[in-house]
Amino acid sequence: MRHYEIIFLVHPDQSEQVGGMVERYTKLIEEDGGKIHRLEDWGRRQLAYAINNVHKAHYVMLNVECTGKALAELEDNFRYNDAVIRNLVIRRDEAVTGQSEMLKAEENRSERRERRERPEHADSAEGDDSNDSDSSDNADE
């Protein structure tokens, strides 16, 4: 069996069907003796260019180990499913189980956002305390 990285884009109107589609595709691979090494749902993202007048799509990535027969059946499912607007299959030398660069970048972005928001709250809390003491000093005078 060979290792593959599969990315497919689902029409944004069918985003709620992604879970069922992924379940169907993983079942197809596992029934043929294959294995899912990594499954990542990247969610709805902006496309670089419009595909069939659609500007966003729901991205899903799978790293699998499967036979050529299972892969051909999976590609047929992609081809005849109108909800899948694009797919990409890349043959890999070995199984990739680590987190993808997309998810790492997303986590870094959320961590930076949290750090950026934290000091603002701390500054405003300190500023409120100093204003209270100033107003009490002014009241004494």
Swiss-Prot record:
InterPro entries associated with the record: Ribosomal_bS6, Ribosomal_bS6_CS, Ribosomal_bS6_sf, Ribosomal_S6_plastid/chlpt, Transl_elong_EF1B/ribsomal_bS6
CDD domains for the chain: bS6
Basic and acidic residues bias: start-end ranges: 103-124
Keywords of the record: Ribonucleoprotein, Ribosomal protein, RNA-binding, rRNA-binding
Disulphide bond pairs: none
Region spans: Disordered: 96-141
UniProt-recorded name of the protein: Small ribosomal subunit protein bS6
Gene symbol of the encoding locus: rpsF
